[in-house]
Amino acid sequence: LQPHQLRAVDEADALATKIVALDGFLKGPVFRQLDVAERDRLRRQYGLMGQYLAVLHERIAAFQ
């Protein structure tokens, strides 16, 4: 893989790790104590991170 392709793979790996961590937070007790607006922002962030990861996976698949 080219250097820019390797960076995309690394970025996808790092993002996947962050998504797992955020998912755990969203299921935890602290999340339920946050105000409604902050919970909404975090849920939207989670969804957008998933979309971002999907695009990275599409890009990586196209490297083949």
Which residue ranges define each predicted feature?
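Extended, charge-rich alpha-helical interface modules
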Residues: L1-Q64
